[in-house]
């Protein structure tokens, strides 16, 4: 005999459908009311026409786009280099901080001071100190290009953050894993390489990517050193036209640049969550 | 004949808490020794001292005639000769069953990848797990995970095997499959030290039983002596408690 839902179940389903229809209607109405309110407040503001003309001017936007986009290429180059060295340096510092051998005590000490220092210093300050201070030393073999020094400053600051994220990952691996590896006869470094790090890096990938998204947008700060990146290019355009629209163009490009990585991070986090649920952990 | 493994006058404390007090045990080659005792009697600490996961406070441990508790000994190479299996399996979750088993043979025993995998597949086949070679640990049942953990320990070709409460986290059906594997290893001549609460299994498999009480070897004997004719009041109390709990 084929299954016939009971009349009770049919009633329940009908009630559920009614409730969900009502939720949709309420959400639509609320969004519309909220949007109208914001539109009325902004367009009704006294200076609205002026702001619209100096920040949202389509003519200047089109005019600025090529040079701002060209500047963004520089940001892209900087952040690819910076991301590589940030991850490398961050990993090395994190490993240095988790060592226990007495011989390596100076290394641990340096790594600790490094992370304390560069996590505490405002990025803008590091940029100015590195970008203006190092050329001032007049050491001939050190490059004094704003792009290179700006990248160095980004790496200094962000590797300190990334090192802490990776260290948290290393310390988050269950100690019994390390114990099982050592019991099998693996050395300390073999245990780190084959058992601890693979698990640690997997666990901290979402927060790590979050730091990289932040690094992407902060690559725009190298403009303070005079490198002609997207923000600097927008500044030049603004200086010529006295219109702020180019800054908005640069902002829009930065948002577009970070969205793919942000979505990827979200996707990865969701995937890990569902995998752990499938394992029945927590 | 000299015993394969020998503990003499072992002492271990955590802070002011004396966990092992003057423990001396001989483990002859190819024998199976079962260690019983209440929680907190020092069973796990004794096991952890035996594979040098804990530092000794006093006493000596000899493996094959050489003192492995000597100061400055190559701990890694000693551990490579001792197989250890834990209550919580501790498989590596990021590696497949095959990679879990071949990791130590490749890195420690320096076997070629193909040789190590061939060996691992032979072991998996012998214990009925060959179809799980490429599976990841989280997809296995608890009993399968523990069998893989035992195979992982055996694959390093250890001189003897430490099994610390390997069935405590499993339900009765899964316990049976793990115990079958252990019995098979015994029939192949593996020297084993087993800490367990499975008294029925202990009776069947043990050559000698050691009753640990408050960190001391309180009574030793054959299974018949320990379970049928306990000498001390403490052992009688312990067995009585197990009996009441339906574990004997």
Predicted regions and their residues:
Chain A
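Transmembrane alpha-helices and adjacent helix-loop boundaries
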Residues: 2-282
